[in-house]
Amino acid sequence: MKSTSESPQVRLTRKLPAYCRVVFDNPPLNLMGPEFVVQFKKIMTELEADEHVKVVVFESAVEGYFLNHSDFLAKLEDLTNLPQGPTGLEAWPDILVRLTRAPFVSIALIRGRATGNGSEIALACDMSFASRELAVLSQWEVGVGLVAGGGPMARLPRLIGRNRALEVLLSSDDIRGDLAEAYGYVNRSLPDAALDDFVDALATRIASFDKWAIANTKRLVNAASLPPDVEIAAGWDACMTSITRAAAQERIRALLDRGFQKPGDVENRLGFSVGQLGA
């Protein structure tokens, strides 16, 4: 029997005792603001405490957006004043590090834009699968004078190599499904019509296995592959410094004047849009 716990921006659904799905649902653009972080943190704590959970799939209910960038119209202090998490990191990077270390398997099902924070969640997950036609991944921050805060500078080089990581981060461009697969940014790019069934079958299969074996295999892979927390913390600190710089504020205002944070072309083609801002 399925049970569901709902909250306005993040929903947790249990398909099986061992298999859960987390749905991001903050229309129209699936922006990440302070309230999203608060709700996501509560769900992470619930999942960590559930000894039955073996696999969690992360997906979106908002057409066109897996999870988008931060909400630049929200008060920054509402985010920075959130308490540090159990890792000792600030609230957002704490969630991502806990997700990577959790004793269950995390899978990102990417349909639509995974921009900034959405890309950071995909990088924190154990696996990610993208819609060939509809997925777009982006670390867009440098294009507006920012440094990303959720750890992509620490994670991407280990995942796709230094040179490709620098291309993704410094171009601030959109990376579509097939190129993301070729770079190793995602596990696979699949036809959109096949994506849901593939991810569900994989999650159901993993959920049928022994949790001790799953958790210990993941723990040992983590020990061989994850960046230390100090690298994640350094990225967050650089992000917070970058937000207050005049250069970043000017570029963000210029984007807002063109339609940023509203449904439309600027958000749909954010990589192109930041490239039009000029020097």
What annotation goes with each model-predicted range?
Residues M1-P17, E63-Y65, S172, R176-G177, ...:
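C-terminal alpha-helix plus adjacent terminal tail
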